Amino acid sequence: MNQFPNQPGNFGQNYYKPVQGSIPANSEATNFQQNNSRENKSECELRQNSIAASMSAYPNGMYAGAENHNVENHENYTMVGHDHMEEVYGDDLVNEPRIAYSSDIVATFDGKDFGSNLHVDDTLDQQWAHFAGKQQHPLEPREIPFPVTDPLNSKIEMKQFTNIAAVLRYRGVHSAKKTAFIILDNKGKEFTSITWEKLASRAEKVAQVIRDKSGLFRSDRVVLMYRDCEAIDFVVSLFGCFIAGVVAVPINRFDDYNELSSILTTTSARLALTTDANLKAFQRDLNAKKLHWPKNVEWWKTNEFGGFHLKKKAEMPPLQVPDLAYIEFSRSPIGELHGVVISHRTILHQMNCLAAIHATAPAYESDKLDYLSIDREYTEGLSKSGLFLTYLDLRQAIGLILGVLHTVFSGYTTVWCPQNAVFVPGLWANLATRYRASFMLTDYAGLKTIAYNYQNDPKATLGFSKKHSVDLSSLRMCMVDCLNVDCEFQEIVSDRWLKPLGNQNPRATFVPLLCLPEHGGMVISMKDWIGGEEFMSPKGFKSPRTPENEISEVLLEKEALKLNEVVVLAEDDKARRQSKHPNTIRVGAFWYPFVDATLAIVDPETQVLCLPNIVGEIWVDSPSLSGGFFALPKQTEAIFHARTSFISSDTFQPIPSNQEFLRTGLLGFIRKGKVYVLGLYEDRLQQKVEWVDNGKQDTIFFHHYTSHLVNTIMRKVSKVFDCSAFDIFVNSEHLPVVLLESPAANIPTEANGNQVVINYGLLDLITTECVECLLEDHQVRVYCVLICAPFTLPRVTKNGRQEIGNMMCRRAFEHGTLPFLYVKFAVERAVLNLPVGEDAIDGIWSSYASGIRQNLLSDQELQYSGFIDRSLRYDAKTSVDISSCHTMLQLLQLRVAKNAEDIAYITIDGRGREGKNITWRKFDQRVATIIRYLQKKKYIKPGRVVVLMYTHSEDFVYALYACFYLGLIPIPVPPLDHMRLSEDVPAFLFLIKHYYVSAVLVNSEADTALRAKTTSQHLKQSAMAAKVVLPSFIVTSKISKQTKSIKELNVKLDPICLDPAFPALVWAFWSPDHRLTLTAYNHQTLLSICQIHKETCQMTHKRPLLGHVRSMSGIGFFHTCLMGVFLGTTTYLLSPVDFANNPLLLFQIISKYKIKDTYATFQTLNYIQNQQPTKWPNLSCLENLMIPHDGRISAFYIASLQKYFVKHGLSPYAFSTVYSNCLNPFISTRSYMGAIPTPQLLDLRALRHGLIQPCESADKPYALPLLDSGMVPVSTQLAIVNPDTRELCRVGEYGEIWMRSSANAISFFQSTDPVDMMRFNATNSDGFLGNGYVRTGDLGFLQITSHSMGPNAPVVDMQLLYVLGPIGETFEVNGLSHFPSDIEDTIERSHPRIARGGTAVFQSAGRVVVVIEALGQDFLAAIVPVVINSILDEHQIIADVVAFTSRGNFPRSRLREKQRGKILASWVTGRLRTTQVFYIRGSGEGEFQSSYVPDYNPSLRSTPSVSSRSTLPQRVF
């Protein structure tokens, strides 16, 4: 019979020979698919239906394997608790399934067209054609050729029992006095034991109490909380739940309260069974941790229940067990908690298979010794069916299956000892001899300790007991629970431990177990003697079984394995002899698949059956497997109901199977029917390898397995306690990472307990050895290595033992939460795909790179705006022609002449009350008073420089206009801040000395501040040290008032003051670094600023103005001092001090006086937001809230501000950002645009090339949200120009923003710097723009977008300006340009321990340096990879140095702005106060990472909360 009609020849017939006793495919196949239940069917009938189904499960005759266990089990556990189906299938704990993602579609950045293109693999059909007819088909399930009987009574067939609880009742009657369980202490002495009769009696009692007193229904969940030494109480409660018809939920971790609460919540358990001692200990733990008892849970102490006593003539209660038996909770490789449901039928299926395997295990003559010749102290009462010895946890996984369930099923006696007992040399072998152990369950960790102790000191084992010598001849199976077979060690155990201690066939005795601890601990492969090997091997070949081939292994070519190909160089004995050859890997086999299992090797990415000799994921289907996860339907569907595909030879298309499999997550292959496992899918590393062959670049991926890398590290790197290896996906590349635990990372302490400096030289040596050995042995180019102290990496519990969890390590590494002390990078070898610009030397502004962009965008328009001239015309208030006015003084005289009694200024106090009204007449008189006083001073003449140091008051305005009249050059500056005298005083003295200040005009408040003891002494001492002669300080508010007006004083403006080159006003701008910039404005410019502002913002004299903060320059200055005079309206003044005390006062004034247009800084709005005021006024009158900025706008910050203020009544259309700088306070604005700002997504990859390209999604790591700065106002023209070639940029690229406006400053005050002079009167290379342009020094672009002009308004095209940032802050790496703000934003988002606004990125001596203000100074090495990865992933560059400063040492200005210049200067001079410095590439002058002693806390596993990132209160005035 050919089962594969589409395959050539008789491949299927030869490869898969039908099992004897199977039935034709056409007789029962259809019936099987209609009736999936195994109820009321014999094992033979089930087997026949399974074979019949296997021949029809796949389309086109493809083999499908055993009966669909998932169909049955899915039915089983979905029926659990018919009243609780919704609860079982709840979505509340659905996690992401473990699914690998295919890389058929890859998004790449094309350097030619600078675009993001999707390249689709069009060769997929050819790949399928390569698979067709060549795939490796699943291995058939084998049949048990004999009935499984009771080992104690061969007449009793075990198939008559319908559940495991019935078997216990049977044992309690027919093996009543035999010992069931024996518990030993750490020294091997019997601690407690129980017979089958007592075990059954106590279990019946627990079941009776649950039925009578708990109020639970069938299938309700009951939690079991017992410690490992309380195994007997655990078994009693477990079977008590089985008998009572409830579902048991074992919980093994009491120290994790969150896990306990999660399990109780998920399972809705209302009853918990435990012991009295355990309950008291749990109570103490809760009290110590200040936790509350879980709610709605009743706690019972089962050790007080006693036994069950049946009344006379009464019958045992009938067993009415539900489908589910128990739910075992475990953690996935990535640490996710989930419960696996186990049904009673699943238990019986597996027990039958295990019993058959154990029954066929070879027994030897010495195993049939007369028990009278053995010490009766230990052997009396033991079961004659066999003795089971283990130290694994009996409450979970394989320990529960073999040590408890199979013990009951087969009637064994189980002897359990704690894991610590294996560390006592000779004790384990003595226990096996003492109890004549037939079966032994261990793991590698314990067995290695036992075997190596014997190798080091054989006498300790041989002479352990004087009563009898060690003899393991009775041992039939030494089962080892493991993930990989350690070939070298199994030789040691077989030949150097079992054989010397009397075992006659040690290689047959050693049995590796391949279990699924994540899926209930089920066995999927182990050594057996059932037969059926001829159906597993190719062409039905069956090799004779000898002691030599009881251990199967192969020697593989290492290079081929990197490509997922299996190339066998030698097998078995030859493999052992040739294992020392280089470039080979020795891999051991478990055995054939489990008896009733269908096993397939599947490509984890495509889910298609693999070709022969190809590594793939092991998928298995068996009635002995669990049905799925509890309350996780999505994950259950993905993991337990996976369907593989077969490639049709006719259509070359994948055809899904009808059979469902369990995805084990194990990677391996099949050879001659035997299963070889290389590791978990999550533990496989891959790395890209590139080379050039004949001018063509080729790329492949090499795969490496964590177990192989770990073994190499442990063998070759000194001082390594344990380690973990994994890869991370950064910048579209897989980068290997190694985490080491080393005693060298223990923080040393002196005798007095003080911590001493860590030996970083030794740590560097260890990491270097690790990098080099992996490169030499495996060609793995390690990305980074980190070191921490032993027992600090995340661990998972397996068989009661803690093992490093690679995926948990990876997650903690990516979050930067592990306590690492040292990190070493090897990026030069590992990172391959760093982008390079068109001109790697001269950068994006070179002629070559610019020419490429120009050619690419040759069909696009040039970037420049239109120009609309709006000169002075008529004054709206007086209807007077003011086109002939040249100064603000003429408009002031117009107000005095026409509206003398109108109110000019009103001061508002801290309570919102109005001060004295200042009419235009009084305003004129106050100005005249100061003029008259200053005229008497001989040293004050036209053209002299004076400093106006005033608080926010009308006195400042009076002094300003007095200077205008006298032809003085005023420089307004704020008063000295007594908290920052070290910055303010030097800047003030610099101003006096270099600009020859003749006088300093102050008011009373400023004078009081200057006369303060601290300030005056600091000022005088600094002046003496700097050899600066302080000018006169004139308190203008104390001048005697007079009633004469300016006109009566006959004050006339000096004609020289009307010269366009004469600076009527000088604005002082301090950068965050407190570097001073002075820009000069003439009288005509001041008028133009007011005119542009009036026209753009539609301002009239009918609405008042408000001046509050930042009144010394910019928008705040002309709102406070000029616009009121220009419009002829009232100006209200609010002191910044009063605003700071009552932030809501600002909006109360706006609402009360119906102010339509005003301004506010970002610091002002942020201060209001942080204060969270209540009782907001009505803000419907405010139509234009201008927010000046001099760089790029944060889209997220604006969105948060807008959301907050809109919630309190401000119109979303009122937010108007204004782009301004020291050369023009009103370059562009969003005022009255009628459109809500919408971020535009730009592609960062294109931006580095100088191009503007939209990004398709905000989820992309290279997406940059950018807000526009509005439209160009009247009398202003902008152009985007290449800063180097001075050519106009085209649409699609960005350049420097040039501006031509009547509001431009006339010069940098008294500057002779050629660079400063070059910025004025600039012209482009071809003269197209003409003259009169000023270079802003900022990069940006113009773009036409369509917006609606308000609600229900038509859509119009607008030309908007987008500002990217200062050109002086950008730096280039590999010919690509980067904005520090983008990188800093990435860094601050990467880790919660990085302070907000606490990063600075700059380039120094060719290195990219990152300075970070960290919250807390312990284990900073864990943050470094997070920072480097985030920069590499989003910006494709590698930072060369990462330096950390402590809280408060990061230089900031008084407005909490980072001081970039000061940071750079401090770094270059070595004066930056750093805590630790990490050199990513190279080191600084041969030094290692800075010596630093952290506050060590072994329990540190988490980072500070986000709330710890709050900053100090910000000053806004």
From Swiss-Prot:
Asked if the keyword Glycoprotein belongs to this entry, the reply reads: yes
Instruction: List GO BP terms, alphabetically.
Output: acetyl-CoA biosynthetic process
Subcellular location(s) of the protein: Membrane
Q: Which residues cross the membrane?
A: 231-251, 397-417, 510-530, 612-632, 720-740, 956-976, 985-1005, 1051-1071, 1114-1134, 1261-1281, 1353-1373, 1408-1428
> What membrane topology is given?
Multi-pass membrane protein
Question: Which InterPro entries does the annotation name?
Answer: AMP-bd_C, AMP-bd_C_sf, AMP-dep_synth/lig_dom, ANL_N_sf, Dip2-like_dom, Mug62_dom
Query: Which residue stretches, if any, does this entry annotate as coiled coil?
Result: none
Pfam families documented for this protein: AMP-binding (PF00501), AMP-dom_DIP2-like (PF23024), Mug62 (PF24919)
Q: Region (Disordered) spans which residues? A: 1-26
Locations of Polar residues compositional bias?
1-13
- Any idea which UniProt keywords this protein has? Glycoprotein, Membrane, Transmembrane, Transmembrane helix
Q: Extract the GO molecular function terms from the UniProt entry.
A: catalytic activity
The secretion signal range is none
Chain positions carrying an annotated carbohydrate: N35, N40, N76, N917, N1178, N1321
Q: Name one GO cellular component term.
A: cell division site
Q: Kindly give the Gene3D superfamilies that the UniProt entry links to this protein.
A: 3.30.300.30, N-terminal domain of ligase-like
Q: Which family does it belong to?
A: To S.pombe SpAC22F3.04.
Protein name listed in UniProt: Uncharacterized protein C56F8.02
